[in-house]
Amino acid sequence: MRPSLALVFAFLIASPALADPPDIHVDVPNRKGLEVNVVEHDIAPGQSVGWHIHHGTEITYVLSGALNLQIAGGPIRHVVKGDTFEIDRDTPHRATNDGAEPVALLITYLRDKAGPLAIPVPAPSVH
């Protein structure tokens, strides 16, 4: 395992001991222009994250709560604590917390280093 990726995994194992872990940003060795980001994202009850894309792959683990996830072209999927999901590069998606509890997500992105993490997009048309 490459040293920088080993640091990411070591941090993930140790992070529960931290009160408020920082976001992690690590360059991908031998892959210029790519980085790995690991972030914790919370969604309050009644809140949503509108349609958006990432210039990279998103892998998410639901730490707590329940979420309605919609990926363009697919049905709404209900995900709960312990579930994981993957969203391919540049795929529009959105999420809503319709429950009474906050949702906590641990998200890993393998993405282009340049540019914003998330890019808002219009809702996909339904055919």
Where are these regions (language model features)?
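Short acidic-glycine-tyrosine-enriched beta hairpin
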Residues: 28, 43-44, 67, 73-90
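N-terminal signal peptide c-region/cleavage motif recognized by signal peptidases
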Residues: 14-16
